Amino acid sequence: MNIKDKDKLKEIFQIFKEDDIIEIGEKIIGIGGFGSVTEVKTKNGKYFAGKLIKSKKTDEIEFISEFKNKNIVQTIKIYNKSFKGENYSLILMEKAILKDLTTLNQNLFKGLLKIIIDTPFEGIVGDNLIRFYARQIIDGLESIDRNDICHFDIKTDNLLIFIRMKIKLSDFSLLKQLKNKEKGNKTNEVEIPGGTPGYLSPEYYQEKKRKRKVPFNVAKKQDYFAFGSTLFYLKYREEMLPYNEYDDDLMTSDYIIDLLQRAVDLIQSKEILSDKDFKTFLCSLINYDPNERPNFEEIYRNKWVNKNVQEINKIYAINSQNEEKLIMELNKSDFLITKKNELKKSDNKFIFDYNKSK
């Protein structure tokens, strides 16, 4: 739903006031191409996220209403209403208390997370913390992979953070069910519906002004590629594939492959101080050839992914007292509203420079 007028959005949101919804927030939390989100309060005093979409977007509604997984944002209830001849759905979902991984990653160096983490930070994000995130993302990916679904928009903005640093996948507006339910047969090809520049794989750009149809097994590799881009950003606080929004003609398959090769060269260079197993795993995920990327079983069993599991779970367990302290700190800080472009490059200990690898 591509409505950018916040006043119109607020007007549409208000028609969903029901007996069990007593308050719909004035502040629009997020506006996307397929939906907008605000805060909703129910009569029992609980707060949820309310996502407004046009009702014809049935794939997302069907999926989220049926699917249950600890690393997928859960749907509480779906309301349907008409407004000026258009049908809308309000999806009531659990609300992320710490927003998303983009916001969290931007603030790792501001000291706020010392409240919840028992070990000190050193500049770039440590492998244990990245692994802690990665294992939860993998658990979410496994559940949608097993059900023959592609998310097609995995990125840090769509990875929400809940109590005890639990990561949950959100925003299934681009999902594709890779199975014909009526015939019971898997499709041979699926069209990549789009996604977010910087997280889109080279196969998306293979044809110009195109319908980007790829084989079913390749489609799943798009989610794994985006997972690799996510790990890259979490680790190095840099976009892996800088996007030229003013010249879409530059975004060709060859251009993306060239950027990827430079990224791989830099990751593998000695000046990048990362765990060798992490480098190998990351480079496999962002391979420009989808057939060379690991399948899910290989991801799940990867050596780096399975390092220090018990230690990680112990280190990042948060008790109730610390959770309350964390929330208090967040409420009186700019943690939840920090914009990406406000960060200074000097905040990073390491900056990727693609020119070095030319």
Spans of model-derived segments:
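Activation segment/activation loop of eukaryotic-type protein kinase catalytic domains
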Residues: 162-199, 207
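Conserved C-lobe activation region of Hanks-type protein kinase-like domains
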Residues: 207-225, 229-268
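Protein kinase glycine-rich loop
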Residues: 26-32, 37
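Terminal C-lobe "cap" of eukaryotic-type protein kinase domains
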Residues: 287-312
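Catalytic-loop of the protein kinase fold
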Residues: 145-162
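Conserved short submotifs of the Hanks-type protein kinase catalytic core
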Residues: 86-100
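Conserved HxN/HPN-centered segment at the entrance to the catalytic loop
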Residues: 68-79
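Activation segment signature within eukaryotic-like protein kinase domains
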Residues: 133-134
